[in-house]
Amino acid sequence: MNAVVSTITQLLPAEIITTDPEQITLYSQDVFTVGPPICAVVRPRNIDEVQALVRACLERGTPIVTRGGGMSYTSGYIASAPDSVLIDMASMDAIVEVNLEDRYVTVEAGCSWQKLYEHLAPLGVRTAYWGTLSGRYATVGGGLSQNSIFWGSGQSGTAADNVLSVSVVTGKGDLLETGSAAQQRAAPFTRHFGPDLTGVFLGDCGALGIKVRATLPLVPLAGAKGYSSFAFGESGPMLRAMAQISRESLTTECFGFDPYLQHQRMKRASLAADAQQLTGVLQNESGIVNKIKQGAKIALSGRRFMDDVEWAMFTISEGRTEAEADHQAKRIRDICSSEGGKELPDSIPRILAANPFGPVNNMVGAEGERWLPVHGLVPHSRGEAVLAEVEAVYE
C-alpha cells in the first residue's frame, strides 16, 4: 500500500477513502484532460477531516488536488505528479447560515449552485452571482476556484466579484478566515477587513488553499422579468448591440449563438425535452392567464423561427416592477434595431430562465462528436476583433 494511503487510512474513516481502480481512473481526469494517476480519493465530511488529511500529506510530501463537481475542463483539479491525493468536496455541501437581515449566505464549498438557488428562492432572495448552466453539478467552491461566469453576470460580474469571505485550509493544515470573518466574534458581512485576502483564493483552482466554506452576498429575487431574442446577419452588429446593452446594465444575462452552434442545438433537442421545459416555463409564470398566454406563444413558435437565423442574441432582464422590466425591454429593442437586429420569439431565453440548471449534455454533439467549450474574457472594445481572429482559425 502507498505510504500516504496507509497513513490517512489510520487517521480517517475508511468509508471516506477509496483506492478503487475505476474511481482512480475517473478522478484522474477532467472533462478534457487525462492526468497522471492519483493514489486515492478522499471525501471529507467536515473541516477537521480536511485539516487532518492535509497535515498527513504534508508530512509525507504528497501533493493534493481539490475537486468540486467535476464540470471543468481547465486541468484545475488534474494532478501534476502521479500518486497525488484528490480531495472530493462532494460530501461538504451544507448550507450553513442564511442571514436575511445582513444579506449573506454561508455554504460549504461542495454545495451545488442548484441546491443553493433552490434553498434561497422560497425566501425571496438569491446570490448576486448564482452559478453556471452546469449548476446542478457544479459547486460553489469550484465556481470560485475557476472564477466562473453566467447567471447574474450581466449586472454582477463573475463569481469572484461576489464573495464576502472564504474559509480556507492552508497547505500546513491551518484554518484561515478572510474578510470580516477573520475578526473574532464578527459576522462575515463584508469582504474588506484589512488587505483583500479573499481575492487571493479566488480563481486559483485550489492551488493556494482548500476552500471549505464561502460567504456570498444576497439580493432580492426580481419582481418582474423581461425576455428578448434577435437575429443578426453578421456577428459585428450583434456584438456591438451586446456591448451597448452591457454598458447600460440592462440585462442580467445576455448571450448569443453562432450559426454552427445553434443549428447543432436545434438538431439535438427533442420534443420530449421541449415539453419538459415548457412545464418549467409555466411554473415560472405568475397568474393563470399569463401561464396560458406564454405557453401558447412558445408552443406555436416551436423551433422553426431559428431555421434561417445566422447569428442570434438573447437577453434576460430583471426589474423590481413590470414597468421597469418593460422599460429595459424597450431600450434593448431600440439598441438591437439600431444595429439591424430582427426581433424573434422570446421562447429560448424564457425556457432557459425557467430551467436554469438543465442537463449537462454539451460535452457530446448531436452525432456523437466530442464538444469542448472555449472561453475568454475581453473588454467590449476588443470583442469584434477577437471573434474575427477566432473565426479565421477555422476558415
Model regions and ranges:
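Flexible loop/turn segments at secondary-structure boundaries
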Residues: T25-L26, S72-S75, W113-K115, L218-P220, ...
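C-terminal substrate-recognition/cap domain of FAD-linked oxidoreductases
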Residues: P21, L239-E395
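FAD-binding subdomain of flavoenzyme oxidoreductases
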Residues: A94-V98, E108-A109, W113-G256
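N-terminal flexible segment immediately upstream of the FAD-binding catalytic core
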Residues: M1-R55, M71-R103, A269, S301, ...
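Short cationic amphipathic helices and targeting signals
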Residues: C39-P44, V105-T106, G226-A231, E310-R320, ...
